[in-house]
A protein has these predicted regions:
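Conserved SAM-binding loop
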Residues: 1
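A conserved structural/catalytic subdomain of Rossmann-like adenosyl-cofactor enzymes
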Residues: 42-221
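S-adenosyl-L-methionine
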Residues: 4-42
Length: 221
């Protein structure tokens, strides 16, 4: 893994030790994942989990080096300078194995904003890389009350469609925060595995229909 914030980086390493994972069994690097990735020699990966910072600034736009970076070039555009969200998604997709799965926590604006971000969503949908969008409850993560989403990526899907799950009501209130219980998690996972329509909760949408909706990936659409 890789983390740019030194405090979070050190906490991550401490967490490994607390779970009895020896130093030689993990490789967590300190640095900028987008402009200075540290694991070129290790990719591709069969499992990727990421909770990147929401809508941070980066070089982006028309940077001549990044636009030719093999992680970002397939979409034909770069994520905007003011919003790096989809750059993290393209990075994860690039380093994902053909038989792998990636899950990235996303700021909701990623799902509907226009411009370059719409073009990147179009690339992801037209190439059938998005497996599922899961709408999470608000007030779930530390530091933000915004209702985030999870985008699940796969490169070897059997059908040309995308599953949408509205899990915004799947939580219990704990003091001032919301929390997913094991029962909530099981409900979401069962819908994810079954890939069937469930009224007011899950819907499997053909990618052609998503294209007709201007590549808007909002679960409430």
């Amino acid at each position: 893994g890789q983390e740019i914030n030194i405090t979070t980086y050190n906490l991550c390493r401490i967490n490994m030790f607390l779970h009895d994972i020896d130093y030689d069994k993990f490789d967590i690097a300190l640095g900028d994942t987008l402009t200075d990735p540290q694991h070129w020699d290790d990719e591709p990966f069969e499992a990727i989990v990421s909770n990147p910072p929401y809508s941070i600034k980066w070089k982006g736009d028309n940077d001549p080096i990044l636009i030719n970076d093999p992680r970002f070039s397939p979409a034909g555009v770069l994520a905007p300078k003011s919003k790096a969200d989809l750059a993290f998604i393209m990075h994860s997709l690039s380093w994902l194995a053909t038989n792998g799965t990636a899950a990235i926590v996303c700021f909701p604006g990623v799902m509907y904003r226009g411009g370059a971000e719409k073009k990147i969503r179009q690339y992801l949908i037209d190439n059938n890389y998005i497996d599922c969008i899961i709408q999470l409850p608000d007030n779930l993560f530390y530091g933000t009350s915004i209702a985030t989403c999870i985008m699940v990526l796969k490169k070897s899907k059997s059908e040309n469609s995308t599953l949408f799950i509205d899990a915004s009501k799947e939580f219990v209130k704990v003091t001032n925060n919301n929390k997913l219980t094991q029962e909530n998690i099981e409900t979401i996972l069962n819908a994810f595995k079954d890939r069937k329509d469930i009224e007011h909760f899950a819907r499997l949408v053909p990618n052609s229909e998503i294209a007709e909706q201007d590549y808007n990936l909002s679960v409430s659409t």
